[in-house]
């Protein structure tokens, strides 16, 4: 896993594909809303679309606010509370 984005509001961790592990065959992303202390893990088709949208966004050299706005689209899907171990 690798942290690919970290701002005061959001953190995104990328999980690479893992051969032989059906659930992680295509990899995935964990998106954390630091302010709401909620997170979501996306994989499969949603992760593939997320990856493509991020590539397009990066080409435009966005500001942190623009990236945070993009990640804000996932706020309503974040139902898991962040739990520290």
Curated annotation (Swiss-Prot):
Pfam families: DUF3567. Disruption phenotype: Disruption confers partial resistance to cellular contact-dependent growth inhibition (CDI) CdiA-2 of B.pseudomallei strain 1026b, but not to endogenous CdiA. Increased binding to B.pseudomallei strain 1026b inhibitor cells. InterPro entries: DUF3567. This is Protein BTH_I0359. It comes from Burkholderia thailandensis (strain ATCC 700388 / DSM 13276 / CCUG 48851 / CIP 106301 / E264). The lineage of its organism: Bacteria, Pseudomonadati, Pseudomonadota, Betaproteobacteria, Burkholderiales.
């Amino acid at each position: 896993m690798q942290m690919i984005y970290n701002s005061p509001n959001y953190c995104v961790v990328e999980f690479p594909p893992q051969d032989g592990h059906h659930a992680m065959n295509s990899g995935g992303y964990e998106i954390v809303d630091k302010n709401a202390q909620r997170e979501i893990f996306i994989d499969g088709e949603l992760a593939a679309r997320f990856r493509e949208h991020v590539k397009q966004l990066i080409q435009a050299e966005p500001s942190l606010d623009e990236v945070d706005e993009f990640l804000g689209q996932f706020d309503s899907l974040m139902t898991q509370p962040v739990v520290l171990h």
